[in-house]
């Protein structure tokens, strides 16, 4: 039966993965990831759970089966005692050099689910902490949620997936947009996946700016790719401005008709710099920006372009934006502005129902 399914990684996602030898081979090493049980309890009525794990060299002298079984069985019994059942537990015992067909991100372990169409591609996800989990999702034609204990933990995953399950987002088109912008000064391509998380591929030629853009996606709870070839032999002005315009357009397109979104976001404070942001996806562009910088540049990024970036993205998103920061370190102030923008955007684009969040009936 086709149904929403979560293909969940084990080590580093459900349970902590030791950084010393990357093996859970004793009860002493068994430690659940924070709030994984409450999250799975919230999700179990909406999704089928399938555990998919690579266990390098399982059954060999480097990782005997019996040393794996004891903590694994204890983990499974703990989940069962709390009302959490997995449809299957699928394990690849091979090492990368074995070149098998079942090691993630390859899909042979899940061949039954593929052949019998047992999962709904529109409402199923891979959840895991590694890039191979994201690649597995791509190979299956579904979305990925790349687990991180801070940036995308189990509380945030449950919040995201419950929103989808309750509003039956599977009947909607995926919130994705691609924008290509070419001028005499820049050649830009932006891709945005609002309902996915994972590795962001951002290359603008301005290192500090790349890092700031990554903060927006990471704290916004979505995934994006940005490539920009700009006239950096002059300066970075056109690169920053045109990237903001293209990103704002992509976000606006991905959000779509705004039906069901929260619309508003408000965050304060953030980090030691006391960054604050309020946002309304109102269709009426406006910005009020307040931050002062002592330095002309942070790395290869002109500090004066910070305000210009947020002005450009607010006007192309058609958003009302109030954003400010205060502090002593210019690097930290700029980074906190991008982070708080991402966190506020996360609130505003969150799906909460099916109604248009406006008394006027239009946004």
From Swiss-Prot:
Cofactor(s) annotated in UniProt: Mg(2+); Zn(2+)
Binding site for Mg(2+): 9, 11, 129
Assigned EC number: 3.1.3.15, 4.2.1.19
Main localization, broad class: cytoplasm
Pathway: Amino-acid biosynthesis; L-histidine biosynthesis; L-histidine from 5-phospho-alpha-D-ribose 1-diphosphate: step 6/9; Amino-acid biosynthesis; L-histidine biosynthesis; L-histidine from 5-phospho-alpha-D-ribose 1-diphosphate: step 8/9
Region (Histidinol-phosphatase): 1-174
Disulfide linkage: none
Catalytic activity: D-erythro-1-(imidazol-4-yl)glycerol 3-phosphate = 3-(imidazol-4-yl)-2-oxopropyl phosphate + H2O; L-histidinol phosphate + H2O = L-histidinol + phosphate
Binding locations of Zn(2+): 92, 94, 100, 102
Record Pfam families: Hydrolase_like (PF13242), IGPD (PF00475)
Transmembrane segments: none
Gene3D superfamilies reported in the protein's UniProt record: HAD superfamily/HAD-like, Imidazole glycerol phosphate dehydratase, domain 1
Keywords of this entry: Amino-acid biosynthesis, Cytoplasm, Histidine biosynthesis, Hydrolase, Lyase, Magnesium, Metal-binding, Multifunctional enzyme, Zinc
NCBIfam families recorded: HAD-SF-IIIA, hisB_Nterm, Histidinol-ppas, PRK00951.2-1, PRK00951.2-4, PRK05446.1
Name of this chain's protein: Histidine biosynthesis bifunctional protein HisB
Lineage, opening ranks: Bacteria, Pseudomonadati, Pseudomonadota, Gammaproteobacteria, Pasteurellales
